[in-house]
Amino acid sequence: MTCKKMKLLKVYVSSTDRINHVLLYEIIAKKAKDFGIAGATAARAMLGYGPSSILRDTRFFELVEKYPVIMEMVDTPEKIDQFLEKELLPFLENQPKGCMVYTFDVDVYLAKMGDTKIKKCQCEE
């Protein structure tokens, strides 16, 4: 089976975090796109807590709009490392909002656009 060695960057933020009236996860997605990161997704978490130990649950989101948002971005290890060092970490470190950022290596077995063309990946050992 063939694959491509990539890196996944995950960022956890709050759904209510804003910088100058813009949602933080939207800012992160735009920064990733502008930097040329291959792909990014923001997803609402069903349940979670962070350093505050306050458990956030979406079952009661009608009453509380605050829930965890998970940003996932994938690209080559070099591109993710450059994005972290030059763009994302300096930006987040200067913000008053809480977050968690981490990466891990992933094997991408299929990267397919919405047509019939399939990009085959070859593992790099």
Predicted feature locations:
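Positively charged, small/polar-rich N-terminal and surface patches that mediate targeting and assembly
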Residues: 1-125
